[in-house]
């Protein structure tokens, strides 16, 4: 009986590992640069949460929070785990927007900020996700002149 339980436990462990290994990876990372003291960050958090729920599983939020040293460090680890450290380095310390990054190529596709409402933000993230997958996205909706252009780099290598 002990042998059977051991075999069953090993089979369960192997199944758990393989399920994680084959879990669907996102098409894009939505890197939310935020700080508790920044009003735009607070607005963006709510809108981005709703937008990501509308978009579904093709986008994964990565939070880079500079409110405390512990949150900053957690964000650095999350960026490292997803191999997007250059994105982290470029804008850490500049809160109030989210960069959309192709999960495969790690290329920055565009950015959204608190000027977008949740529906507009979801639509823009869907467009950027389609672009990351090499697909066309057709929409007649207008975002009223709002741009998905990212802010200039906040941290520039002096060398």
Regions found by a protein language model. Give the residues of each.
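Thiol-based oxidoreductase modules, predominantly thioredoxin-like and allied folds used
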Residues: 56-79
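A short beta-strand-turn-helix
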Residues: 19-28, 84-88
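Non-catalytic, surface beta->alpha helical segment in thiol-disulfide oxidoreductase systems
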Residues: 92-134
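Bacterial N-terminal signal peptides
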Residues: 7-16
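Short active-site neighborhood of thiol/selenol oxidoreductases, capturing the structured segment around
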Residues: 25-38
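Short, internal strand/loop/helix patches
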Residues: 71-95, 99-101
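Typically the conserved alpha-helix immediately C-terminal to a functionally engaged Cys/Sec
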Residues: 40-56
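Positively charged n-region of N-terminal signal peptides that target proteins for export
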Residues: 1-4
């Amino acid at each position: 009986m002990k042998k059977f339980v051991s075999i069953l436990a090993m089979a369960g462990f192997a199944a758990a590992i393989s399920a994680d290994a084959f879990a669907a990876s996102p098409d894009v990372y939505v890197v939310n640069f935020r700080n508790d003291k920044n009003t735009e960050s607070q607005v963006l958090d709510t809108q981005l949460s709703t937008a990501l729920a509308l978009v579904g599983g093709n986008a994964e939020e990565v939070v880079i929070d500079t409110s405390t040293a512990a949150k900053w460090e957690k964000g650095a680890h999350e960026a490292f785990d997803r191999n997007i450290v250059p994105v982290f380095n470029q804008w850490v310390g500049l809160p109030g927007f989210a960069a959309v990054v192709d999960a495969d190529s790690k290329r920055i596709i565009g950015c959204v900020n608190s000027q977008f409402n949740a529906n507009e933000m979801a639509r823009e993230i869907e467009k950027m996700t389609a672009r990351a997958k090499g697909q066309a996205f057709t929409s007649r909706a207008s975002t009223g002149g709002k741009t998905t252009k990212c802010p200039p780099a906040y941290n520039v290598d002096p060398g």
